[in-house]
Amino acid sequence: MVASRAIGSLSRFSAFRILRSRGCICHSFTTSSALLSRTHINYGVKGDVAVIRINSPNSKVNTLNKEVQSEFVEVMNEIWANDQIRSAVLISSKPGCFVAGADINMLASCTTPQEAARISQEGQKMFEKLEKSPKPVVAAISGSCLGGGLELAIACQYRIATKDRKTVLGVPEVLLGILPGAGGTQRLPKMVGVPAAFDMMLTGRNIRADRAKKMGLVDQLVDPLGPGIKSPEERTIEYLEEVAVNFAKGLADRKVSAKQSKGLMEKLTSYAMTIPFVRQQVYKTVEEKVKKQTKGLYPAPLKIIDAVKTGLEQGNDAGYLAESEKFGELALTKESKALMGLYNGQVLCKKNKFGAPQKTVQQLAILGAGLMGAGIAQVSVDKGLKTLLKDTTVTGLGRGQQQVFKGLNDKVKKKALTSFERDSIFSNLIGQLDYKGFEKADMVIEAVFEDLAVKHKVLKEVESVTPEHCIFASNTSALPINQIAAVSQRPEKVIGMHYFSPVDKMQLLEIITTDKTSKDTTASAVAVGLKQGKVIIVVKDGPGFYTTRCLAPMMSEVIRILQEGVDPKKLDALTTGFGFPVGAATLADEVGIDVAQHVAEDLGKAFGERFGGGSVELLKLMVSKGFLGRKSGKGFYIYQSGSKNKNLNSEIDNILVNLRLPAKPEVSSDEDIQYRVITRFVNEAVLCLQEGILATPEEGDIGAVFGLGFPPCLGGPFRFVDLYGAQKVVDRLRKYESAYGTQFTPCQLLRDLANNSSKKFYQ
């Protein structure tokens, strides 16, 4: 039973998610003038306790790089050599961040696995010295303690953390395609148990402080303080330091012990893991789960398992060696380069490159309380924006308000909010059927039906009741913004803000500017999106913008493949097997067959035969029979409420029978089907950069992965071209062009890169 429980606790293992970085606030501190020569780490002495403060300048977060490591070793050597110091406290001067991790840019210059492995070994040696410190060191944690930051903390003799939402602990290296390389794979299993350690390392999930305490990852919690003469953050940090200093004194005086007693279940699990058979069963179960979920596309999880297994079965020395070697191997893989590229792209897309807007948006108004409008309202009020939600019917408005409340209440169930906080946030939302209050609106976002006439109508109405400075943003997914703005009296204030469904889950926001959109309007739209917690790309106006324009030719190819006789389940298996989180046929059902038809027709008119392939007639017939996808319960699949299982909709065969296309054997292998889907997407993405729709490859990759589910392991269409090779992409396109024509003709920019192997999107 104990063995099954140890294995069962791994059931929380989830599929890959993308790392969300946390912003941190700077906080000043005082230190002795003799120590000011150090940039990142200084210390002062309180009685016989050294208080080591980490504070990387000109950065919102503390990260571990070679300079920080050098200063840390220098400081620790001084402390160990000073007989007046008997213990130490390690604390950050940034209230929202302990240490956010190691600086991944250290790996950028590595050209061999051995170079990367040396970086791992240096970290291991530093933390081993800390672990064996003759003077106890207490880690005082407030804010994010991630990656190398957690490895630093668990090498200390004791850990105290603030019990608030900003304090999270985790090892997200797997999300970057690598593993914890400074001893994490060896210390974590001993500290929290093998099942919990696997769960942390294989998912990269963040652990909140209260949960970390129950796991044994943190030894003591400190409640945050409220406001006083100083801010709550400053008061909490000072209190945390005071508690940590007192405990460090107690450790040095041997009045308290760093060893925590384990509960019965922890003792039973630890005992079970001493039995070789149980350990082998755990390894086997975890490996099988990893292989099933990653489909062999991500090498890091299996290497994490190997490193842990080596340490447990062969001892510490072998474990640390395995960790550093596997870290070096992973750092040079295409997958890690792709995932690190996405991380860097995310950081770029969370900044407002258009500067601060002249006027901050304080009052937001949203037109349309449907799925999208209510979703936009939820992410707005959740971040403190006062929001008006207008609809034309009482029923529609009520449904929208209920959706917002449910979204907030779900957070209460997950203990992310209290019921008081939920009600306070919900009070920021005012629902109405008229334009009352719009005279104070700084921005109006319309989420009405995708019909140009309807959008023209509401634009005119909005401009008649809002102030001159008010921005009008359209949440259209395909209609050109310049066409919407054609009836505007203030075209410089009109912009596109394309959200993705479900709005509270999807991170991407695609902002679309016309030739007349002012820079200040763009800056305001980006500022609102960032406040809503979005990752933002800004693109030029045009049919389909960037994301819908890339999706349309890919979906056209999907329809053709279905017409050629590949059933939806096989197509889904092939596309998820290539790295898409959702299969192609399932994606069509999720988007909505009616929406797919609408987009296919509009973009078909705009781009002609190049967007051809599959017959739009298939979509039309499905819509006529009410097969709209998940929202209607039937699409390519049949969906049942409350059930994750789905069966093929056999009635689709009756529709397809008159639309069958003969498959071409030379381009119909499983691999060809995968590359037909991916290359049409990639070619269109590169063409968007060529035409100036996209400003940078980074935004193109972020938009594709975060908005459309392009395989994260490939890093986005532009990173894929760099890693796979432009010439190979062009060769693939030429092969399919010979079978299908101009739909696969490679764009000029791709051909240019193929002709010059030294040119890449990322130099």
From Swiss-Prot:
Protein name per its UniProtKB record: Trifunctional enzyme subunit alpha, mitochondrial
Site feature (Important for long-chain enoyl-CoA hydratase activity) residues: E151, E173
Residues carrying N6-acetyllysine: 46, 60, 129, 166, 214, 249, 289, 295, 303, 326, 334, 350, 353, 406, 411, 436, 460, 505, 519, 540, 569, 644, 664, 728, 735, 759
UniProt xrefs under NCBIfam families: fa_ox_alpha_mit
Modified-residue entries (Omega-N-methylarginine), positions: R399
Function according to Swiss-Prot or TrEMBL: Mitochondrial trifunctional enzyme catalyzes the last three of the four reactions of the mitochondrial beta-oxidation pathway. The mitochondrial beta-oxidation pathway is the major energy-producing process in tissues and is performed through four consecutive reactions breaking down fatty acids into acetyl-CoA. Among the enzymes involved in this pathway, the trifunctional enzyme exhibits specificity for long-chain fatty acids.
EC number from the UniProt entry: 2.3.1.-, 4.2.1.17, 1.1.1.211
Entry coiled-coil feature ranges: none
Modified residues (N6-succinyllysine): 46, 60, 166, 213-214, 230, 249, 303, 326, 334, 350, 406, 411, 415, 436, 440, 460, 505, 519, 569, 620, 634, 644, 646, 664, 728, 759
Protein source organism: Rattus norvegicus
